[in-house]
Amino acid sequence: MGKPTFQPNNRKRKKVHGFRARMSTKNGRKVLARRRKKGRKVLSA
């Protein structure tokens, strides 16, 4: 068996999937728009 592949790291989580990371690119804004349209309670990490 290998190591567990999920190695939690809150800093990386925010940097990669956070709201400001999403807002910083055109496609990221598309992601947020799509999630708003769908009615997601949580838009980003």
UniProtKB/Swiss-Prot annotation:
Cross-referenced PROSITE patterns, in alphabetical order?
RIBOSOMAL_L34
One GO term (biological process): translation
| Positions of region (Disordered) | 1-45
Check the record and name the Pfam families matching this protein: Ribosomal_L34
Going by the UniProt record, its keywords in alphabetical order are: Ribonucleoprotein, Ribosomal protein
Q: Where is the composition biased (Basic residues)?
A: 10-20, 27-45
The UniProt entry's GO CC annotations, sorted and at most eight, read: ribonucleoprotein complex; ribosome
- Signal peptide span per the entry? none
Q: What GO annotations for molecular function exist for this entry? A: structural constituent of ribosome
Gene3D superfamilies from the UniProt entry: 1.10.287.3980
Highest taxon of source: Bacteria
Similarity section: Belongs to the bacterial ribosomal protein bL34 family.
Name of the protein in question: Large ribosomal subunit protein bL34
What organism is this sequence from? Halalkalibacterium halodurans (strain ATCC BAA-125 / DSM 18197 / FERM 7344 / JCM 9153 / C-125)
Organism ancestry = Bacteria, Bacillati, Bacillota, Bacilli, Bacillales
